[in-house]
UniProtKB/Swiss-Prot annotation:
Keywords: Disulfide bond, Endoplasmic reticulum, Glycoprotein, Hydrolase, Serine esterase, Signal
Job of this protein: Involved in the detoxification of xenobiotics and in the activation of ester and amide prodrugs.
Species of origin: Mus musculus (Mouse)
Protein name: Carboxylesterase 3A
One protein family per Pfam: COesterase
Chief place where the protein resides: endoplasmic reticulum
SUPFAM superfamilies per UniProt: alpha/beta-Hydrolases (SSF53474)
Gene this chain is encoded by: Ces3a
């Protein structure tokens, strides 16, 4: 059978799988269909709206901007989230909520994943809200799996509304929840003590998951079948929630797309030093944590987001992370829930280069530029300067012309920050007994041709539009809308929605008519996701061996040599 025949057969099988899904979950409606659906929750009544989805008659009830915590205003700006207050009457949940405070210009830089028409919403500190997308058909006695999406954006930018869950809800027959959390200094700056505890952005997501447990049933969701999933920083948060005792029992499956907490770009920092540096930049320097926080509380929120030179990360030795994530992993101190995770084949193809302000340097890149652009990240990893050329040599194995040098830098940055940490994390999960499903997304979306160079392959976050059914979204101003998708890309989106929702439903992405996806075991098999999916073996085996065996050995040898040189000098 040819590849084209195999692809056509797989496409037909997925359509049959989707049709069977709609038969298994019948479309008998309890009560009349209304364009402004209303739902009673323990906190009050909400009124949403109904939207359609392309290529299906199914409708989706959408509820936007529902608060899952009290607004973190005034003295609550740097506090852990508090439970939401009930409201009187009917709350309007039909309009898009504001985004959390962030640098909107930087947000607009990261919008061009697939849709350059994406709306940018207003910003506000009153932003701890979530959106719910639920198929209108409610079957008596049955509850749908719940998929809670955590957006990415380097913990600095992003919003829940930019990820429209209507197509995934309709085609996957799941309830999709998208959440917001405090970003930047509002979510992560810390004095390292009680005056400004860290990890507030993570705690916001925990609060949202608690809200889901107590409130999702009236929307047709099953609180006992919750999957958390996220991309980039969202994937980092998903993996963090797995390790935190605070989120125990709040979810039952997890998906990390291009992001895990052991990434080298996210290390626990000297919290007090970082807080002082930031405070000095806004004229709030103080030797006292209490005074520093009081000064920051007096500032206008929008004035605080203009300062870009601040390191954002998690803190340890608190209620969220009692120990460093690596130690929690090594000690297997986490629940063994089914876990699906993966990367793209060109993580630093374009988007992250643009976000990091180094895209303009990529056209004419010399070997000297390669080392210069890599040096800050390698230094952050505490790599001795004498060892850095070893890393460069490893990545220049395909030549030294400009295109090879550019590709070497892209691969190096992608491996350090995302790919190798994901592979290491998957090994920890497997050793602990989690059912693990690994993927590499390999398809270059056809829309890239409009604004990305021809050398960009499957860029960072490019799978999101397929997971969320971008070709089938009716709102073409949504970040992930993909109206120009080819027929093959539509089929890929249908397949990925089926796989992700099947995983949410059963803890396994395999199903009748879907491409076989092997569970990770000693064979180290994974799924190569593209127009013609296939099974791969030992993803980036050589690079993983370099970072986990070869390079550590060379560093040890270098340190031994340094010590041996010091002994004669001391004598």
């Amino acid at each position: 059978m040819t590849n084209m025949e195999t692809t056509a057969q797989a496409g037909s099988s997925v359509r049959v799988w989707m049709a069977c899904l709609l038969l298994i979950f019948p479309t008998t409606v309890i009560g009349p269909k209304v364009t402004q659906p209303e739902v009673d929750t323990p906190l009050g009544r909400v009124r949403g709206r109904q939207v359609g989805v392309k290529d299906t008659d199914r409708m989706v009830n959408v509820f936007l901007g529902i608060p899952f915590a009290q607004a973190p205003l005034g003295p609550l700006r740097f506090s852990a989230p508090l439970p939401p207050q009930p409201w009187e009457g009917v709350r309007d949940a039909s309009i898009n909520p504001p985004m959390c405070l962030q640098d909107v210009e930087r947000m607009s830089n990261s919008r061009f994943t697939l849709n350059e028409k994406m709306k940018i919403f207003p910003i506000s500190e009153d932003c701890l809200t979530l959106n719910i997308y639920s198929p209108t058909e409610i079957t008596a006695g049955d509850k749908r799996p719940v998929m809670v999406w955590i957006h990415g954006g380097s913990l600095l930018v992003g919003s829940s509304t930019s990820h429209d869950g209507s197509a995934l809800a309709a085609y996957g027959d799941v309830v999709v929840v998208t959440v917001q959390y405090r970003l930047g200094i509002f979510g992560f700056l810390s004095t390292g003590d009680k005056h400004m505890p860290g990890n507030r952005g993570f705690l916001d997501v925990v609060a949202a998951l608690r809200w889901v447990q107590g409130n999702i049933a009236p929307f047709g969701g099953d609180p006992n079948c919750v999957t958390i999933f996220g991309n980039s920083a969202g994937g980092i948060i998903v993996s963090s929630l797995l390790l935190s005792p605070m989120s125990a029992g709040l979810f039952h499956r997890a998906i990390s797309q291009s992001g895990v907490v052991i990434s080298k770009i996210l290390e626990d920092l000297n919290a007090w030093s970082e807080a002082q540096n930031f405070a000095n930049s806004v004229a709030c320097g103080s030797a006292s944590p209490a005074e520093l926080v009081q000064c920051l509380l007096q500032k206008e929120g929008k004035d605080l987001i203009t300062k870009k030179n601040v390191n954002i990360s998690y803190t340890v030795n608190d209620s969220f992370f009692p120990q460093r994530p690596q130690k929690l992993l090594a000690n297997k101190q986490f629940p063994t829930v089914p876990y699906l995770l993966g990367v793209t084949n060109h993580e630093f193809g374009w988007l992250l280069l643009k976000f990091w302000n180094i895209l303009d340097k990529m056209e004419h890149l010399s070997q000297e530029d390669l080392l210069e652009n890599s040096r800050p990240l390698l230094a952050h990893m505490q790599l001795p300067p004498e060892i850095m050329p070893t890393v460069i040599d490893e990545y220049l194995d395909n030549g030294s012309d400009e295109s090879a040098t550019r590709y070497a830098l892209q691969e190096l940055l992608g491996d350090i920050t995302l790919v190798i940490p994901t592979l290491i994390f998957s090994k920890y999960l497997q050793d602990a007994g989690c059912p693990v499903f690994l993927y590499e997304f390999q398809h270059t979306p056809s829309s890239f041709a409009k604004f990305k160079p021809a050398w960009v392959k499957a860029d960072h976050s490019s799978e999101n539009a397929f997971v969320f059914g971008g070709p089938f979204l009716t709102d073409e101003s949504s970040l992930l809308a993909f109206p120009e998708a080819t027929e093959e890309e539509k089929q890929l989106s249908l397949t990925m929605m089926a796989q992700w929702s099947q995983f949410a439903r059963t803890g396994n992405p395999n199903g009748k008519g879907l491409p076989p996806w092997p569970q990770l075991n000693q064979l180290e098999q994974y799924l190569e996701i593209g127009l013609e999916p296939r099974t791969g073996v030992k993803l980036k085996k050589g690079r993983l061996q370099f970072w986990t065996e070869t390079l550590p050995r060379k560093i040890q040898e270098w340190h031994r040599e340094q010590r041996s040189r010091k002994v004669p000098e001391e004598l």
